[in-house]
Amino acid sequence: LHERVRAVRPFGWGVIDVRLDQEDLANAMVRFVTLEGVMPDGTLIRILPSDLENGGFVLPRSIDGSFPPSLDHLDVLVGIPTERPGGPNWVLDEDAGTAPTRYVGMRVGIADLNSGEKREILLARENVRILFSGEDATGFITLKVAELERGAGGKVSIRDSYVPPCVSMSASPWLMRLVRGLLELLSAKRKGLAAQQLAASPASLDQARCSRLHILNAHLPLLSHCSLVGQAHPESLYLMLARLTGELSTVFPSLDPMDLPKYDHFNLYGTFREMDLRIRQALKEEDIRVETIALSLMSECIWQAAVSSE
């Protein structure tokens, strides 16, 4: 199934949601509170806060010894042992969690759907491990989910600007803020253009202004939906912004649609940061080259205005 989906959706893997325990992180310990995603090989992983009741789905790890002060940042990855042809690929023993098999046993209490009686059963679950940059990941399928950095006083925190490969833009607070920022900017531009159109007489409508207003009116509802729902795939968001940029290049010739950054699933921060800069620069160019000049009626059919030499 994964191979068939990948044929039509090559970027259908990545993080859906990830949260680290902030208290543990302050004590140099990496522990997942929530982790949902699709591994590059199509394996689904889902770790929820309720899993903590059973001692945690993934064993936490200390960063001591892995994150010296000389290191700019520390990559945090999750890994699952690759499937071994001929096995073994599972150990149905909850005490064998350190074995490098793809699946290990986990005892959980499950209520019967008919009687409601609760029983403890043994389930096989993915043997998800926490890995750090610089470690040997041979034999593991890995997904980089976060970057850690040191702040003032050596305090460890999550690097906000790192956007992991993801299947939902809500996986990255930074990406969500970027979309909201663009939405606010474009909405403000649209209101300004609409006010100018309403104030102008039918005989003095500006075709360039009409074109800009049309472009913004067509794209604002789509960006608004992405911002509210947050479930769009990053590639879908990229195509949306690329189309917006292409249409803006009609009224801003300095904006070359063939010079846009390429979509990079491994570097979403760089991709969308550059797209955001291109759009903002084009709109800023409009502010620079357009100036409102007040006219005063001198006599019939004669208007006068003071034009700055600049």
Question: What are the residue ranges of the model-derived segments?
Answer:
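Elongated alpha-helical scaffolds
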Residues: 56-93, 99-101
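N-terminal "first-domain core" detector
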Residues: 1-33
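Basic, amphipathic N-terminal segments
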Residues: 18, 45-46, 59, 186
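Mixed-charge (acidic/basic) macromolecular-recognition segments
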Residues: 100-242
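Terminal low-complexity "docking" segments
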Residues: 49-65, 305-310
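Short loop/turn segments at secondary-structure transitions that flank enzyme active sites
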Residues: 43, 82-86, 154
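Extended, amphipathic alpha-helical scaffolds
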Residues: 225-310
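Type-3 copper protein
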Residues: 35, 45-48, 71, 77
